[in-house]
Amino acid sequence: MTENTSTRCGYVAIVGRPNVGKSTLLNHILGQKLAITSRKPQTTRHNMLGIKTEGDVQAIYVDTPGMHKANDKALNRYMNRNASAALKDVDVVIFVVDRTRWTDEDQLVLERVQYVTGPLIIAVNKTDRMEEKAELIPHLQWLQEQLPNAEVMPISAQQGHNLDALEAQIAKHLPENDHFFPEDQITDRSSRFLAAELVREKIMRQLGAELPYQITVEIEEFKQQGHVLHIHALILVERDGQKKIIIGDKGERIKRIGSEARKDMEVLFDSKVMLNLWVKVKGGWSDDERALRSLGYGDL
């Protein structure tokens, strides 16, 4: 840290149960789509940094997988471990909860964050959907009783309600530091990682409840040739039947997945994209620690 610096910089963990709006919150704060979203729980599998630099303040957000009770497969253990690890060595923790709904998985997260010694903010999401705001007060009071040292803030990650106030509160808690990243950098993740995540998002939005959790995406080629970015993506599934579902009747579903992913890639990478998708069966990959490591899932 330089002497008499007026700049602030620090890490902010975004935690909560699956499908509560953590990635939507990150995307709205950043002002662009970075983290993938869907209505299905456990869409986020990896911790990912989203970096926002505004004036003298650089907030480095850690978007985490939702903490959940299922721990039966190596992939589930990896996601839970990633989410828990994010609580360490950060400057601020944001605990995202729903405006009224409280689940066993919310309770699981609460039991972890109650040991946080630094600043803790409970972001009560989706409050824009409540016609009678007075109905929210008992829930806010109950949350405050559970975590007396936390600050409770109603927000809407989707609509952006009260996010300016949330960011201002976060900035107050960040330590005085030189900025860790260049002003124009928005993530620590590679373009190949982001491309794979966009394909996986489109699959999750198209398919049924169970199948998406047995699918992962690997980028085999990522090459800029002139004005066109060529991306070859391999979709891994665990059974032949799953491969047929992804391909769809006469290849219609995989064409739709590819078309939607390509549009988002062209916006993200600011380039024309030629996207090719293949589907391959790799039985039991989601419970094979060696396979998970080879697919970029880190330490298990």
Swiss-Prot record:
Era-type G domain sequence ranges: 8-176
Binding site for GTP: 16-23, 63-67, 125-128
Domain KH type-2 stretches: 199-283
Region of interest (G4), residue spans: 125-128
InterPro entries linked: G_ERA_dom, GTP-bd, GTPase_Era-like, KH_dom-like_a/b, KH_dom_type_2, KH_sf_prok-type, P-loop_NTPase, Small_GTP-bd
GO biological process: one example: ribosomal small subunit assembly
Gene3D superfamilies attached to this UniProt entry: 3.30.300.20, P-loop containing nucleotide triphosphate hydrolases
Region G1, residue ranges: 16-23
Places the protein is found: Cytoplasm; Cell inner membrane
GO cellular component: cytosol; plasma membrane
Residue span of region G3: 63-66
GO MF annotation terms: GTP binding; GTPase activity; ribosomal small subunit binding; small ribosomal subunit rRNA binding
Membrane-related topology note: Peripheral membrane protein
Subunit comment: Monomer.
Protein name: GTPase Era
Natural source organism: Pseudomonas entomophila (strain L48)
